[in-house]
């Protein structure tokens, strides 16, 4: 299915790449405005759930401008950040250098469906607002499994679909009518933020994503809904002893 914001498969990946390149320089500003600053609270919640220990190896997928990667490093992790938008990565590198000139975070341009790291490399994987943008969600979750160490954790912050029909209608109305206005005013690109609702319409609800994770072998899968389900954090663990697959 296609429309002015949403296309499937590789066309979708190219479209998303263009959108993020066009807003990279003002991405942090518009995030603060469109979420009323709440995205910072949601990311801190994810980090608490991640239980990162000093010395652990962490991969922040779809890292964007680097908020989660920088926070993981502050918690003592050895961090890699992966994103397919070089424009977003440039902002992430600048932020990292400004916050900590000696930072050892490595930001890599690459595809979250074909992660350029060996099997069983990372103790912790995080992904903020990235699952919804994958051209093939199942392929992405499989590759996340591959690079996670046995006993490792996956945590994904993503837009959700509230169960309550009234709240869902209010939320979708905000995404449809107000968010593109913010995008046009503050970064000159309404389409980039109109895309959020269109991509969410094609993205599975929280429990469907959780079921996909379980089917692939992730254990202790749970969904933490935030603000009545407008946002969610998926938490999952790779078994300590890798079962036959």
Description of each model-found segment:
Residues 219-245:
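Core SAM-dependent methyltransferase catalytic element
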Residues 14-15, 157-212, 216, 222:
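C-terminal alpha-helical "lid/dimerization" subdomain adjacent to the S-adenosyl-L-methionine
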Residues 26-29, 35-56, 71:
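Conserved alpha-helix/loop element of class I SAM-dependent methyltransferases that forms part
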Residues 27, 125-126:
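Hydrophobic beta-strand segment of the Class I
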Residues 138-153:
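A short glycine-rich, Lys/Arg-flanked "PGG" loop and its adjoining helix->strand segment in the class I
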Residues 1-18:
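N-terminal auxiliary segments of SAM/dcSAM-dependent transferases
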Residues 57-114:
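Class I SAM-dependent methyltransferase SAM/SAH-binding core
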Residues 113-124:
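A short acidic, Gly/Pro-enriched loop at the edge of an enzyme's catalytic core
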């Amino acid at each position: 299915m296609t429309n002015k914001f949403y296309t499937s498969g590789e066309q979708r990946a190219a479209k998303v790449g263009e959108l993020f390149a066009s807003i990279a320089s003002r991405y942090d500003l518009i995030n603060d405005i469109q979420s009323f600053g709440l995205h910072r609270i949601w990311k801190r919640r994810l980090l608490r759930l991640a239980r990162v220990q000093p010395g652990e190896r962490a991969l922040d997928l779809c890292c964007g401008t680097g908020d989660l990667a920088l926070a993981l490093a502050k918690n003592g992790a050895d961090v890699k950040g992966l994103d397919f938008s070089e424009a977003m990565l440039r902002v992430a590198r600048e932020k990292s250098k400004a916050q900590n000139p000696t930072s050892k975070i490595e930001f890599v341009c690459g595809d979250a469906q074909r992660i350029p790291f060996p099997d069983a490399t990372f103790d912790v994987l995080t992904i903020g607002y990235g699952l919804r943008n994958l051209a093939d969600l199942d392929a992405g979750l499989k590759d996340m499994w591959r690079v996670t160490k046995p006993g490792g954790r996956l945590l994904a912050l993503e837009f959700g679909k509230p169960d309550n029909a009234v709240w869902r209608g209010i939320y979708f109305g905000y995404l449809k009518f107000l968010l593109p206005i913010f995008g046009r005013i503050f970064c000159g690109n309404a389409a980039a933020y109109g895309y959020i609702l269109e991509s969410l319409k094609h993205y599975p609800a929280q429990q469907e994503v959780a079921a996909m994770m379980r089917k692939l072998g992730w254990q202790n899968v749970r969904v933490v809904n935030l603000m009545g389900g407008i946002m969610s954090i998926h938490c999952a663990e790779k078994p300590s002893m890798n079962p036959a697959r």
